[in-house]
């Protein structure tokens, strides 16, 4: 298979983890933000080390991008460039998630932040053969009184570039019990729901995310392995797993790439999708993810078609966009 030419779909990609290093350098100079001494050092600070010890070390790579992403221009540009980078490797549909609350440090309103991200995406959609949507994330450690503000701020953009609500950040057992009020609020406003769960060993969180938070999709979810309740509910309800194989190895969720359960899950009828998570932090692309999965697990063209269709069906896109995406199957 020509992996670059394959049509691809990425449903789990973080904006602040997918910024071009040269853009960081350019914006940091504009905003007088202190940088590491040279480009190599900047890249090093943005990219997870080979011997990354855990998710917390992985998350440290977001510090510099978040410093520069505090103006309308920076957010719009970075949004555009992410969609441009994806389009140039034949990603036909991309859902990007970010936490607007992390971009208020210089006084931007939540509305301005969301509008800037959507504007950058729309500019890329006009220029390239790519469709997209945004997912509003909150981090588990956020003050709870800010969560409804994010949901309210995104509501005017629903169906116009925003589609879903996500809970992210470091994972602790039992976190779902704190959030039903907020996912219910988001559902009432018209959001779809995806939740990061089962990334850091806690398979029970996946079961809770589906039963308590009404999650339609699960970010990562690899640790349904070993938790029968979680495994069964994901399989029975056809809850899509947004797997991010390279990232899962880097954060030590999975010991090595060949141990990733994606192929095993697929064989057993679980809905799996292939995603990047963070293009810059993980130093990856969709082409790389698809290639590694197919080559490591011996997946055929037919297997890839099935995963591509899973991604289309699981996307928080309109029926019209889904029909458009299904049209690319014959190119595989």
UniProtKB/Swiss-Prot annotation:
Q: Where is this site: Important for catalytic activity?
A: 220
Q: Does the keyword Cell membrane apply?
A: no
Q: Which residues bind substrate?
A: 14, 16, 169
**The organism's place on the tree of life at top rank:** Bacteria
Q: How is the cofactor bound?
A: Binds 1 zinc ion per subunit.
Name the enzyme group at the top EC level: hydrolase
Q: Which reaction does it catalyse?
A: adenosine + H2O + H(+) = inosine + NH4(+); 2'-deoxyadenosine + H2O + H(+) = 2'-deoxyinosine + NH4(+)
Stored Pfam families = A_deaminase (PF00962)
* EC numbers: 3.5.4.4
Task: Name the active site residues.
Answer: 199 (proton donor)
HAMAP family recorded: A_deaminase
Annotated protein name in UniProt: Adenosine deaminase
Protein's organism: Vibrio atlanticus (strain LGP32) (Vibrio splendidus (strain Mel32))
């Amino acid at each position: 298979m020509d992996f670059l030419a394959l049509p691809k779909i990425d449903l789990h990609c973080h904006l602040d983890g997918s910024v071009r290093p040269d853009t960081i350098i350019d914006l940091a100079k504009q905003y007088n933000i202190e940088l590491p001494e040279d480009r190599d050092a900047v890249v090093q600070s943005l990219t997870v080390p080979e011997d990354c010890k855990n998710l917390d070390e992985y998350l440290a790579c977001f510090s510099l991008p978040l410093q520069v992403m505090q103006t309308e221009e920076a957010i719009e540009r970075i949004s555009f460039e992410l969609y441009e980078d994806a389009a140039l490797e034949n990603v036909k549909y991309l859902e990007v998630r970010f936490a607007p609350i992390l971009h208020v440090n210089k006084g931007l309103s939540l509305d301005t932040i969301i509008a800037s991200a959507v504007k950058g995406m729309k500019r890329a959609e006009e220029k390239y053969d790519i469709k997209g949507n945004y997912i509003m994330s909150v981090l588990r450690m956020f003050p709870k009184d800010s969560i409804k503000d994010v949901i309210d701020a995104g509501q005017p953009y629903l169906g116009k570039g925003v589609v879903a609500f996500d809970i992210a950040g470091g994972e602790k057992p039992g976190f779902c019990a704190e959030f039903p009020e907020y996912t219910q609020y988001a559902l009432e406003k018209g959001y779809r729901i995806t939740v990061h769960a089962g990334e850091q060993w806690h398979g029970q969180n996946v079961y809770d995310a589906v039963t308590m938070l009404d999650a339609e999709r699960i970010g990562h979810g690899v640790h349904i392995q070993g938790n029968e309740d979680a495994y069964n509910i994901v399989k029975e309800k056809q809850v899509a797993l947004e797997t991010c194989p390279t990232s899962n190895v880097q954060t030590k969720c999975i010991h090595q790439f060949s141990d990733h359960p994606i192929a095993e899950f697929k064989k057993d009828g679980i809905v799996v999708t292939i995603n990047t998570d963070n293009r810059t932090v993980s130093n990856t692309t969709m082409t790389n993810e698809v290639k590694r999965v197919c080559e490591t697990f011996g997946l055929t063209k037919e297997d890839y078609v099935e995963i591509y269709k899973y991604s289309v069906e699981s996307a928080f896109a309109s029926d019209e966009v889904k029909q458009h995406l299904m049209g690319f199957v014959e190119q595989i």
